[in-house]
Curated annotation (Swiss-Prot):
Keyword line: Ribonucleoprotein, Ribosomal protein
Gene Ontology MF term list: structural constituent of ribosome
Coiled coil: none
Family per record: Belongs to the eukaryotic ribosomal protein eL39 family.
Protein's recorded name: Large ribosomal subunit protein eL39
GO biological process terms on file: translation
Amino acid sequence: MSRNKPVAKKFRLAKALKANSPIPIWIVLKTRGRVRYNPLRRNWRRNDLKV
């Protein structure tokens, strides 16, 4: 990908980067195990971003 990106695309990539993290353990404890994993998790090789 080019170094010079449109700002809107850069913001979308940054949002996807932040969303690609596991949920904190305290959320699992707070929800008593109802929320166990992040469904938005993706691997950079396997899944494609529609940005």
